[in-house]
């Protein structure tokens, strides 16, 4: 009974293959569920930090207070958050002599410098960073910077971006104020990250920036979940993370590659720190992106568990760096890293990975080729060349046909319900993966029915290995050409290595069986009889048939891939002496009973090798499926909602789904013809269900909404109408929604839409007039914004026509913190503006020059009561810029000035009435469908623009 059980358990038969496959998918699914849920059950009480429970409760309370209202840099509530943090920090500092506080706002710190994000740009910024230093016991050690920004965008409460980072830093500051670290810690609670990373820029001008060498930057580009290690400087810092974060590590160099390639549109303060020579870690929440920068980035939509994950990760890192000695033998090569279900974290040098890729790309094919040569030489005398080609072309034909079908389905899906990915990526991914595997199953099973064969799986594994070898070769070349920054290829390395190894095991089995078969033939002479089989599956054979009843002469043919002999012998049923043979036979005969065999152990060796299929499956399928699914899932989870940001991203993400469906099923294809009926039906049901959902479900829900962007603009040159601009993806979503607004219907307003670049659309209509400030009379545009040319020597007769032209512009604005000046360069190859001066109320000024010229100047000030900017502009006459072509009457400078207001969720007292600051935006929020969310289009929700000539 037990022997029969073992025989049935280890045969290559449909039931066994199907069970192993379903167990693989079940295991991957359970690990996936564990990975996404386990962090919620790791409580502060389980931490090695004794004060963690209280600090987390304090952090949650601080988060609630910080996110009480919208607090972008361009709002008065930004000052409230600054003052709240400063009071908390000063209270902590008073308890320790090791803590020092520097408030940029109190110290009137400002910078005027080139804008690295804008070609020809300059930026003036008045900082209100709060910088804190905890003096370490050993001041000779390079310090650690911890950074987070406390500003938000006008449409977001900023709970995740970046409230959780800020309150995590407060908690860590509180802890180390009472437990002095070995290494000096510097905290940068910075302001105005959202519009230029300016808080980080200002910090690099602070004296304490010279104390730090490492940085931990906390950020949020989603609203919850786990905080991921987006990127790290090099393999040395990746090893620090690996050694430090033992509880729930979460990081993947796929994200890092996305940043290197520009696939991620957002940037963080980490970029500024890294460009200034700091090494460290960029840790952030990354999903869901359609709630990022919207009103749902609030405490209501996040959790203590998410806060604790970021807090705990940053704390573990800080503890390790602050307390432990760090090896000075630094490796600055980019790192390849990933975690395994939050249990383990792996990291290595991308240069090391490149070397391993080179070895793998050479060694594994050479080994496989040698086994191929040996196997071919063993069977060439009886080899059926025609049948070999019949076996060899099965998978390529099946793969190509299924690929075309899959591409057709993907195109049909992406055209019929383009944005279904925004709702969720798993449904389309499962639909395409199950379709691909079903198609291959049907085609390969049909081939097997027409012409049964032995050991197709090894041939197929070799072909899959060749395909993945090509992919790995291309990725390896990209890794080298990118200076080892192509750090997301580890999944392809694992896929090729394991599939290739499984194929080599099959080839080794062929060779071993071929050697024993040849010895058997030599000993037996001509006494061997032909091998017979009906080519049926093991489920159709009876256990009463003994393995050794197949005489040793049958082994002659066991090495062949030729067609099964369907002629019957005296025994009407035979067990394959190949991969379908039983592991143990009933009542095995003695050696004397087998005149052609001199060693019974050889028969048992062949029997064991006949079960190499299980080893091949376990090597080729479970691990590769888990790793590849993890890579595809992470990539799609991060990028799926970028399809709302442009047509290019849409194509890229759908291609990723297409490739993901193929990569997930590649290791299974060699075994697909061995699926049983129930497994095939399970795939069919999964395919039909997920495909139907993809076609029938709405792409947008309240939890996964359509994300559109809002701004209201008054262009003084075109009149005083306040034009509402709503930006979103083209697809007929915006215009019907806007036409249903009460103000549009009641006043018979026109809503006109126009195509923008990259598949976007902009719809406009005349909205309610804004009320950005208090006034005792109705507010006009001139009360809010006006321009005055204080001086201009362009037409001064004392100025040589070759001399630079100087002018001074006064921008009068109320309740304002930011403006931008654009200098237009019509008919010129080079920007004419070469010098900019920002004058202050105390008669001091900041000046910046450039021989390359300026195209833009951003102005950021702190004082709402300061109602004007004064800017000096110097530009060259066109006679110096047009290769000697004189144009004396055309030396004016064309420029445009735009100023921003970021508040909407409050009222202004106008002419004795309480009026909402931005009623047009209120109306959109009130009457838009629940499956629509709003983010800001510009720096402010309200912009006023005027173009002038100097």
Swiss-Prot record:
Binds 2 Zn(2+) ions per subunit. Residues 1-14, 377-386, 448-459, 509-614, 674 are cytoplasmic. Its cofactor is Zn(2+). The active site is at residue 193. It comes from the Eukaryota. InterPro entries: Fxna-like_M28_dom, M28_fam, Peptidase_M28, PFF1_C, PFF1_TM. Belongs to the peptidase M28 family. This is Vacuolar membrane protease.
């Amino acid at each position: 009974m037990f022997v029969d059980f073992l025989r049935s358990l280890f045969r290559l038969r449909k039931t066994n293959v199907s069970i192993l496959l379903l167990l693989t998918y079940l295991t991957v699914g359970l690990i996936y569920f564990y990975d996404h849920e386990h962090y919620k059950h790791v409580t502060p009480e389980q931490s090695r930090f004794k004060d963690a429970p209280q600090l987390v409760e304090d952090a949650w309370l601080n988060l609630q207070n910080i996110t009480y209202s919208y607090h972008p840099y361009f709002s008065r509530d930004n000052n409230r958050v600054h003052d709240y943090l400063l009071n908390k920090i000063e209270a902590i500092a008073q308890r320790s002599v090791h803590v020092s506080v520097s408030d940029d706002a109190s110290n009137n710190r400002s910078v005027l410098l080139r804008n690295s994000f804008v070609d020809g740009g300059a930026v003036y910024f008045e900082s209100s960073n709060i910088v804190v230093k905890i003096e370490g016991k050993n001041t000779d050690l390079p310090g650690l910077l911890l950074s987070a920004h406390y500003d938000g965008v006008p449409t977001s409460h900023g709970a995740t971006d970046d409230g959780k980072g800020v309150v995590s830093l407060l908690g860590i500051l509180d802890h180390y104020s009472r437990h002095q670290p070995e290494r000096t810690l510097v905290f940068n609670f910075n302001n105005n990250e959202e519009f230029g990373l300016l808080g980080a820029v200002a910090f690099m001008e602070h004296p304490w920036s010279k104390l730090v060498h490492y940085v931990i930057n906390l950020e949020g580009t989603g609203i919850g979940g786990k905080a991921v290690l987006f990127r790290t400087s090099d393999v040395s810092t990746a090893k620090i993370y690996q050694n430090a974060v033992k509880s729930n590590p979460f990081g993947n160099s796929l994200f890092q590659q996305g940043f290197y390639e520009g696939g991620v549109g957002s940037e963080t303060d980490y970029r500024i720190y890294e460009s200034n020579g700091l090494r460290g870690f960029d840790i952030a929440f990354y999903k869901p992106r359609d709630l990022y920068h919207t009103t749902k980035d609030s405490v209501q939509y996040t959790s203590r568990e998410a806060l604790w994950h970021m807090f705990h990760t940053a704390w573990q890192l800080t503890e390790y760096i602050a307390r432990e000695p760090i090896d000075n033998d630094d490796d600055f090569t980019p790192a390849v890293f990933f975690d395994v279900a939050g249990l383990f974290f792996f990291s290595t040098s991308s240069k090391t990975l490149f070397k391993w890729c080179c070895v793998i790309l050479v060694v594994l094919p050479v080994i496989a080729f040698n086994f191929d040569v040996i196997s071919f030489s063993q069977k060439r005398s009886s080899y059926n060349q025609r049948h070999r080609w019949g076996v060899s072309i099965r998978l390529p034909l099946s793969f190509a046909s299924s690929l075309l079908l899959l591409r057709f389905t993907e195109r049909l899906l992406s055209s019929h319900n383009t944005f279904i990915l925004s709702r969720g990526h798993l449904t389309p991914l499962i639909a395409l993966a199950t379709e691909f595997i079903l198609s291959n199953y049907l085609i390969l099973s049909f081939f097997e029915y027409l012409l049964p064969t032995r050991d197709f799986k090894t041939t197929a594994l070799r072909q899959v290995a060749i395909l993945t070898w090509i992919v790995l070769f291309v990725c390896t070349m990209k890794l080298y050409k990118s200076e080892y920054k192509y750090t997301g290829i580890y999944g392809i390395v694992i896929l090729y290595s394991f599939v290739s190894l499984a194929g080599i095991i099959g080839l080794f089995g062929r060779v071993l069986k071929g050697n024993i078969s040849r010895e058997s033939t030599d000993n037996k002479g001509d006494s061997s009889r032909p091998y017979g089989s009906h080519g049926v599956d093991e489920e159709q054979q009876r256990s009463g048939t003994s393995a050794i009843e197949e005489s040793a002469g049958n082994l002659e043919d066991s090495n062949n891939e030729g067609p099964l002999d369907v002629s019957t012998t005296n025994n009407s049923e035979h067990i394959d002496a190949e991969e379908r043979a039983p592991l143990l036979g009933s009542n095995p005969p003695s050696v004397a009973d087998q005149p052609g065999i001199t060693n019974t152990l050889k028969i048992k060796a062949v029997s064991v090798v006949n079960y190499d299929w299980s080893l091949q499956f376990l090597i080729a399928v479970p691990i590769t499926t888990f790793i590849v699914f993890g890579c595809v899932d992470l990539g799609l989870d991060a990028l799926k909602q970028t399809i709302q940001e442009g047509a290019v991203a849409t194509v890229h993400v759908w291609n990723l789904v297409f490739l993901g469906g193929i990569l997930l099923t590649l290791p299974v294809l060699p075994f697909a013809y061995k699926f049983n009926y129930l497994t095939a039906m399970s795939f069919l049901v999964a395919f039909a269900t997920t495909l139907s959902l993809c076609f029938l479900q709405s792409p947008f829900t309240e939890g996964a909404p359509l994300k559109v962007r809002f701004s209201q603009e008054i262009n003084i040159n075109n009149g005083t109408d306040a034009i509402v601009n709503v930006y979103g993806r083209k697809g007929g979503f915006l215009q019907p929604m806007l036409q249903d607004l009460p103000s549009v219907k009641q006043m018979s307003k026109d809503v006109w839409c126009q195509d923008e670049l990259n598949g976007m659309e902009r719809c406009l209509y005349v909205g309610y007039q804004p009320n950005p400030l208090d006034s005792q009379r109705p507010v006009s545009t001139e009360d809010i914004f006006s321009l005055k040319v204080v001086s201009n020597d362009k037409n001064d007769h004392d100025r040589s026509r070759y001399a630079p032209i100087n002018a001074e512009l006064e921008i009068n604005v109320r309740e304002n913190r930011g403006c931008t000046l654009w200098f237009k360069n019509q008919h010129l190859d080079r920007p004419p503006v070469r010098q900019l001066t920002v004058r202050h109320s105390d008669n001091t000024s900041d000046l910046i020059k450039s021989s390359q010229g300026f195209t833009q100047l951003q102005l950021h000030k702190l004082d709402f009561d300061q109602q004007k900017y004064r800017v000096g502009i110097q530009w060259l006459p066109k006679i110096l810029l047009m290769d000697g072509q004189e144009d004396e009457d055309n030396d004016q400078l064309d420029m445009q000035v735009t100023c921003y207001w970021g508040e909407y969720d409050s009222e202004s007292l106008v002419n004795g009435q309480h009026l909402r600051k931005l009623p047009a935006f209120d109306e959109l929020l009130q009457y838009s469908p629940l499956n629509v969310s709003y983010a800001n289009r510009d720096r402010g929700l309200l912009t006023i623009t005027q173009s002038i000539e100097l």
